Design a protein with these regions (language model features):
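P-loop (Walker A) phosphate-binding loop of NTP-binding proteins
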Residues: 15
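Conserved substrate/cofactor phosphate-moiety recognition/catalytic segment
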Residues: 29-71
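A glycine- and Lys/Arg-enriched "phosphate-lid" helix/loop adjacent to the NTP-binding pocket
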Residues: 101-153
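ATP-binding Walker
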Residues: 18
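Hydrophobic anchor at the beta1->P-loop junction of P-loop NTPases
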Residues: 12
Length: 185
């Protein structure tokens, strides 16, 4: 819970397409806070689309880049902020960060079917691809299986995050409101 005049950082964790960026932007706008997206920081720092970053760097290297961006946002950007955190595979990469008194870490969760409905497809330059809905529906069983596996894996990694926000198919606006009521006011 936010108290007094201290600067606070809300860190939103979750699997891909759960809504970290969308909810984060809405939450920051609602609160009048700054918003940072680690994925955007990766694109700027590494000079490549996210797909290339994932395919070029090792898991440990990706975690190191993400961690350094989070620390940069925490230490160099004064004031209250919301940070959307891209998936981190090792607890040791973030456990000291979420233990900070000025950090509210929240794990966004949703049902696989709801996450599937939010899936989008981009090309090698991170541009939205047209006609992806038909492709998505053709491969629905595969993507639902992948989402379930991601949830199972990241539940084990993110089990140290003290706050869980179950999206349960709500709109991003409703989730931002839920976070505000539960952890900010």
């Amino acid at each position: 819970m936010v108290e007094g005049n201290k600067s606070v950082s809300i860190l939103l964790f979750g699997i891909s397409c759960v809504g970290k960026t969308t909810v984060g932007k809405l939450l920051a706008n609602k609160l009048g806070w700054r918003f940072f997206d680690v994925d955007d920081g990766i694109v700027k720092r590494c000079g490549c689309p996210i797909g290339d970053f994932v395919n070029t760097y090792t898991c440990a290297e990706r975690n190191d880049v993400r961690r350094s961006l989070i620390l940069e946002y925490l230490y160099e950007c004064i004031g209250n902020k919301v940070i959307a955190i891209s998936s981190m595979h090792f607890k040791s990469s973030f456990e000291d960060i979420i233990a900070r008194e000025d950090v509210i870490a929240i794990y966004l969760k949703d049902k696989p079917e709801n996450i599937f409905n939010r899936l989008i497809f981009t090309d090698d330059n991170d541009q939205l691809m047209g006609d992806s809905e038909e492709y998505k529906q053709l491969h629905k069983a595969y993507y639902l299986r992948e989402i379930r596996e991601d949830i199972k894996f990241f539940d084990k990694v993110y089990c140290i995050i003290p706050n869980i926000c179950d999206i349960d198919g709500r709109t991003a606006e409703a989730v931002a409101e839920k976070i505000t009521e539960r952890w900010v006011r």
